[in-house]
Amino acid sequence: MTQPVQTIDVLLAEHADLERRLSDPDLHSNPDEARKAGRRFARLAPIVGTYRKLMAAREDLETARELAADDDSFTAEVADLESRVAQLDTQLTDMLAPRDPHDADDIVLEVKSGEGGEESALFAADLARMYIRYAERHGWTVTVLDEITSDLGGYKDATLSIRSKGDSADGVWSRMKFEGGVHRVQRVPVTESQGRVHTSAAGVLVYPEPEEVAEVQIDESDLRIDVFRSSGKGGQGVNTTDSAVRITHLPTGVVVTCQNERSQLQNKARALQVLAARLQAMAEEQASAEASADRASQIRTVDRSERIRTYNFPENRITDHRIGFKAHNLDQVLDGDLDALFDALAAADKQSRLQQA
């Protein structure tokens, strides 16, 4: 194992401290702190468990070798234990490899139509439904924070909040962080009378959502807050009061709108959370040239040539161009069956992190 012993010792001490804190009733009087501690504990628990299994297997192996020196019947057990120790050692090394610090986070996801007009907006809505169905399969909570619909019910722009309900070390971000980029579709549009296949594109942006807005420094004087009446699909009014909120961050020009909560205060709170997520992502990009390069796949302009994935309807095929993944189950993918693709993307990301370690 290439990781220094000091690393696991530090994690063991932190795990023990968190276990003590989580058993203290006083901690749970602060739900935010309790949730944060619970998430960190959940992240460390599998590492500590694997380490303890490895230590036990090493002790068993040492005992088996001593017995095998006097009795050949223990030779097979030695071989089995050597294999188990090697397996656990590799597993622990993988667990200690550098991880994305946001893996346990919830996300804000934006879907934007691009080239292709009405067809692009319809495809953007298909992508949003795909992510919603995937989230439902995993028991996550999805909230549509804002939506601008097209004449045929597509999405010109939509913002979703996707949150897990537990404290898993592998949260929503760990699964969906690879979705940022341009998604291209090849199909016969509903507006096409000649039956010709057209190509259009929609863009997806994904941000890890800070647990608290306070984690991101936002100066109130840098904000312009506008309120207006919420509207439903097709422009139908759903609220007779000015409950929708639009926040503009003046230094960066970032604009966030939220109109689907029940009150102006709730919409403002959610809009601030989305703004915090976007500003956090921008700050991290600026702070790290490597992170900026990794996020080059996140769209700057929704151009069909800057694609990360193609959805080919005539061939029922999905292709992820970053890792060469291909599958002929597009209908199932659009119904939220994304785990095979996400597993492949996660494996490629893990391999990259191990090489950089």
Swiss-Prot record:
Q: Which GO terms describe its cellular component?
A: cytoplasm
Please name the Gene3D superfamilies in this protein's record: 3.30.160.20, 3.30.70.1660, 6.10.140.1950
Q: How is it modified after translation?
A: Methylated by PrmC. Methylation increases the termination efficiency of RF1.
Spell out the molecular function terms from Gene Ontology.
translation release factor activity, codon specific
Record bears the keyword Protein biosynthesis:
yes
Annotated positions of the N5-methylglutamine modification: 236
Spell out the subcellular localization from the entry: Cytoplasm
Q: What is its main location?
A: cytoplasm
UniProt entry keywords in alphabetical sequence? Cytoplasm, Methylation, Protein biosynthesis
What highest taxon heads this organism's lineage? Answer: Bacteria
User: In UniProt terms, what function does this protein have?
Assistant: Peptide chain release factor 1 directs the termination of translation in response to the peptide chain termination codons UAG and UAA.
What family is reported? Belongs to the prokaryotic/mitochondrial release factor family.
The name this protein goes by in its record: Peptide chain release factor 1
